[in-house]
Design a protein with these regions (language model features):
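Charge-biased low-complexity segments
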Residues: 2-10, 23-137
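Bacterial N-terminal signal peptides
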Residues: 12-22
Length: 137
């Protein structure tokens, strides 16, 4: 006795395949030198590991400010490249409640890993702005 597999025809699946041939997906080549804004990307850059980034921020907390139990914020703008790395020359402190928080934020970002932004499924360079909050413990 042989067993033959049953194949069920699905009209919905057949229609989807037919539509794929009628309207093929177009993948647009991205300009590798272009920097996209968050509004232009379909997938926004994200931290590869929030826990790792939090450790980087905590480990880089300026000692003098930690001793004085001072908290604050550093808002930084930077470019995440297509491989998920922060471009070193792109990091700028937009605002910091203490200059030391701005410097610490820059150092943490340069060691952090990101999932890059994407356009049409392709990883692209993306400009990001991020507030980093330092809380005194």
């Amino acid at each position: 006795m042989t067993c033959t597999p049953r194949i069920r025809f699905s009209f919905v699946a057949a229609a989807a395949v037919a539509l794929a041939f009628l309207h093929p997906t177009t993948v647009v080549a991205q300009d590798a030198s272009r920097t996209y804004t968050l509004a232009e990307v379909e997938t926004k850059p994200s931290l590869a590991s929030m826990a790792s980034f939090q450790r980087l921020v905590a480990d880089g907390y300026p000692e003098d400010l930690k001793r004085r139990r001072m908290g604050g914020i550093a808002e930084v703008a930077f470019v995440v490249d297509a491989s998920g790395k922060v471009e070193p020359g792109s990091v700028e402190v937009v605002h910091a409640t203490q200059p030391a928080f701005g410097e610490a934020a820059k150092k943490a970002l340069l060691m952090a890993g990101f999932n890059p932004g994407k356009v049409s499924g392709a990883a692209v360079r993306t400009k990001v702005s991020l507030p980093i909050v330092y809380k005194a413990q």
